[in-house]
């Protein structure tokens, strides 16, 4: 609690907690303030326990032998621990250290969330940061998170030596952009305004059905 008090008092905008060089959690000032208020009279404990036995076949298929961790946050007071499962609208940034296996494309690496019954959610806005050697994502709750991989589909034959190959695979695997055919992406072809706006909309999670009319004739 004293550490949180000091961080908030000094208006520390970002605070990073590293656990065994395997998991890092970055906490912003607003979240620090919330945790500071919640820790009155006690302490806040952050844990990242490695998960060796995944709960379901779905989770095993998604994560395979890649790392998975049970992230938890508890309030400790008087020897009693109370789980904090949600951040009430705030988020934290998480890094899961990982070195891609031979043949894995970094654009197809994801963070995956595994719920209490073993159902998997692929976190679309996660990504692999080569400079950090980690999969990075944001979340507002604590549970089991791991590193997942989706095989490239479709298999574009014209991007192997392209400078943006990993970025193309990232965008295609998350459904932001599609190829010009089942096997080609045409990476040097210009992007229309419609393609650009569509990709931005998909990235933002917009439902096109909510918009009955559009101002651009080339946006579909």
At which residue positions do the language-model features occur?
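Feature responds to low-complexity, polar/acidic, surface-exposed segments characteristic
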Residues: 140-165, 173-197, 201-220
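Proteolytic cleavage junctions
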Residues: 68, 75-174
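Generic cytosolic/nucleocytoplasmic N-terminal low-complexity/intrinsically disordered segments
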Residues: 10, 32, 48-49, 118, ...
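Proteolytic processing hotspots in large secreted/extracellular or virion-associated proteins
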Residues: 1-117
């Amino acid at each position: 609690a004293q550490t949180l008090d000091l961080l908030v008092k000094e208006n520390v905008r970002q605070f990073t907690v590293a656990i065994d060089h395997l998991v890092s959690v970055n906490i912003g000032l607003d979240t620090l303030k919330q945790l500071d208020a919640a820790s009155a009279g006690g302490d806040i404990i952050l844990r990242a326990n490695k998960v060796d036995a995944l709960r379901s076949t779905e989770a095993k298929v998604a994560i395979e032998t890649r790392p998975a961790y049970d992230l938890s946050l508890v309030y400790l007071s008087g020897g009693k621990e109370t789980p904090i499962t949600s951040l009430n609208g705030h988020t934290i940034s998480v890094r899961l250290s990982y070195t891609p296996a031979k043949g894995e494309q970094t654009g197809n690496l994801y963070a995956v969330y595994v719920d209490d019954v073993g159902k998997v959610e692929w976190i679309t806005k996660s990504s692999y940061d080569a400079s950090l050697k980690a999969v990075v994502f944001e979340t507002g709750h604590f549970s089991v998170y791991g590193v997942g991989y989706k095989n490239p589909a479709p298999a574009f034959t014209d991007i192997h030596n392209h400078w943006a190959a990993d970025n193309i695979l990232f965008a295609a695997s998350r459904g932001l952009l599609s190829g010009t055919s089942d096997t080609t992406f045409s990476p040097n072809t210009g992007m229309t305004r419609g393609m650009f706006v569509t990709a931005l909309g998909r990235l933002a999670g917009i439902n096109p059905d909510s918009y009955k009319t559009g101002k651009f004739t080339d946006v579909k």
